[in-house]
Design a protein with these regions (language model features):
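Conserved SAM-binding loop
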Residues: 2-9
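Conserved SAM-binding strand-loop segment of SAM-dependent methyltransferases
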Residues: 11-25
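Local beta-strand N-terminus motif with an aromatic residue
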Residues: 15, 32-33, 60
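A short SAM/SAH-binding and catalytic strip from SAM-dependent methyltransferases
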Residues: 24, 33-49
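Conserved Class I S-adenosyl-L-methionine
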Residues: 30, 107-169
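Class I S-adenosylmethionine-dependent transferase superfamily signal
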Residues: 54-56
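Conserved class I S-adenosyl-L-methionine
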Residues: 61-96
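Short alpha-helix
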Residues: 88-111
Length: 169
């Protein structure tokens, strides 16, 4: 993903610099920038307050986070219900992240939009999709046919609701 960002920025003639590592662990090595961008990682951050604060501390003008409105694997919730009769959590959400940003004193704006390419970006063979879902669902290989049938019912090719959370510094 970072390589794709680098390529796109270079192609557009945008000055950019990437830093690999966990945020805010690498913050001390990262210079302040006009715009700080964070793409599809917020749901995996254990300590969100220091994460957001470090983003803000490194931006001169703006902080931009792009993320889905709900957890990236929430599309599997119906499968958890089907196979385990479990109702998966519906939180956290992007709205809650925006509330946290505002509670920190940032004037967070949440722009919601549809990602029309969701479900079409990576064309995995069905057996790989089944394997991934089976492992995520903690099922044994002998359930592959059931998993495949469930996936065929919901190929998840509909647009996904995502957002851009941003604030000026």
């Amino acid at each position: 993903m970072l390589d794709a960002y680098t390529e796109a920025a270079t192609k557009r003639g945008v000055q950019h610099q990437e830093f690999r590592g966990s945020w805010p662990d690498v913050a001390a090595n990262v210079p302040v920038a006009d715009v700080v961008v964070c793409h599809h990682v917020a749901f995996n951050v254990a300590a969100i307050v220091p994460f957001l604060q470090a983003l803000n501390d490194h931006a001169r003008r703006r902080v931009v986070l792009e993320l889905p409105m709900t957890h990236p694997l929430s599309n599997m919730s119906p499968l958890w219900k089907k196979f385990w009769d479990l109702d998966r959590p519906t939180t956290p959400t992007a709205h809650q992240l925006a509330d946290i940003a505002r509670a920190l004193g940032f004037d967070g704006h949440l722009d919601v939009w549809a990602d029309e390419t969701w479900g079409q970006r990576v064309s995995l063979p069905m057996e790989e999709r089944v394997r991934f879902a089976r492992i995520r669902l903690c099922l044994s290989e002998d359930r592959d046919a059931e998993v495949a049938a469930a996936l065929i019912q919901d190929l998840d090719a509909t647009p996904r609701e995502v957002c851009t959370l941003w604030w000026d510094v």
